[in-house]
Amino acid sequence: MAGCKVLFFLILALAITFVSAARLLDEEEDIGLVPLPTTSPGPLPTVGLGPFPTANSGPATGIASGTGSASGGLGSLGTNTGPGPLSTTGSSLLPVASSGTLPVTGPGPLPTSSGLLPGASSGNLPGSGSGPLPTVGSGAAATGLGAGAGSVIGGSVPDNTLVFFMHDILGGSNPTARAVTGVVANAALSGQIPFAKPNGANLPVSNGVPSDNNNNGILNNNNVPLLVGLGGTTSNILQNNGNNMLNGLPVANGGQLPSGSSLQMLMFGTLTVMDNELTEGHELGSGLLGKAQGFYVASALDGTSQTMAFTAMFESGGYEDSISFFGVHRTAASESHLGVMGGTGKYVNARGFAIVKTFTGSSGTQQQQPHQFTDGLETVLECTVYLSY
C-alpha cells in the first residue's frame, strides 16, 4: 500500500513538470510573435526639406530649434503604439539635415539656445566669429562666457609721474647755492696772496705788503656762477675791480689766468652746496612745492658735467615726504638722467629715474629772461620723475 502512494506522487510530480514546461514554451512563442515597430506605414524624415537649426531662429519647443518640417508626409505624425510608425513628438520640430548653414566656428556666431536650457546665455560665446572676442588690453569686459567685473589685463597703469622745476641761483643778493671748495679756495685766484705770480711790482716805501698782484681779484662768489653753475661754463666773463670792462661787463684776459690754465680746468673739482626752491612752473614766483638740498661737484675737466646728490623735500607733507636723487647732470646735453635712490614719507622705498632739462640765461637787466626774477645767475632745471614702488 505504501509503495502505491509513492508511485502515485511521482507520477503526479512528472505530470505537473511537463505541464509547466509546455506553458512556458507557449508564452515564449507568443512573445516572439509580437511585431516590431516599423516605419513602413509613415514616411521617414527626408533630407533637404528644411534648413538646419541655426542661432536666433526662435524659441525651441522640443529637442532643438529648426524651421523645416519634420517629414514630407501628407499629415502630421501621431503617437502610436504597436505595429504603427515610430512615436514622434507632436508639436516640436525634429532636427534634420538640410541645405542650411552648418553651425561651424567662422564668420557667424555659434548656435546658442534662447530657450530656458540649463546654462543658456543671451551673450555672445567666446570664440564666435561675429561677436566680440575677449581681448587683452581692450579695456572692456567680455560679454560672453567668463565675463567679470574686474579690470582687463593690460589696461592703463597708475600714473606715478612727478614734474617740478628747481631754481639754482649763484651770486647776487639772495643766492641759493654757494661754491665752498675748489677754485674759490684758491687764494692766488681770489687776490688774497700777494705776488701770486711775478708781475714786476715794487715794494711800497712804507715796507707794507702789496695786496694787488694785478689779478684784480679774478674770482669771487659773484663771478663763479658764470663758471660752475648748473648751466655749465657760459663764457669767460668775470667780475673784477673795475678794469677790463666790455659793454659794462668785466672780461678776463689771458694774463690774468695762471700759465697753461683754462677756465674749465680751474673749475674742476669745485663743490657747490645748494638749498634751491622747487616750484610748479619755470617762473621763480610760481607755486612753491618744496626745497632741494644737497650739493653738486664739477666732475669733468672740460666743464660739461656736474655730479649731483640732493634730496627734494615737499612742503605739502610738512617736508616729511622726500625723494633722493644721485647722478651726473650733463650741462652740454639737452637732457640728463638722475637715479632715484629712495625716499621718505609716501615716497618710501621709491625707485625710478628723473629726466633733467636745463634752462639757462644771463641774469640782470641786460639779458633778462622770462623765468628770472633775481640779480644772481639763475639756472632752472625741469625734473620729470618716474617712480615705481
Curated annotation (Swiss-Prot):
Residues 1-21 form the signal peptide. Pfam families: Dirigent. Residues 50-135 are annotated as: Disordered. Gene3D superfamilies: Allene oxide cyclase-like. One of its GO terms (biological process) is phenylpropanoid biosynthetic process. GO terms for cellular component: apoplast. Keywords: Apoplast, Secreted, Signal. It is found in: Secreted, Extracellular space, Apoplast. InterPro entries: Allene_oxi_cyc_Dirigent (IPR044859), Dirigent (IPR004265). Residues 50-68, 77-86, 98-135 have a biased composition (Low complexity). The keyword Membrane does not apply. Dirigent proteins impart stereoselectivity on the phenoxy radical-coupling reaction, yielding optically active lignans from two molecules of coniferyl alcohol in the biosynthesis of lignans, flavonolignans, and alkaloids and thus plays a central role in plant secondary metabolism. Belongs to the plant dirigent protein family. Homodimer. This is Dirigent protein 25. It comes from Arabidopsis thaliana. The lineage of its organism: Eukaryota, Viridiplantae, Streptophyta, Embryophyta, Tracheophyta. The gene is DIR25.
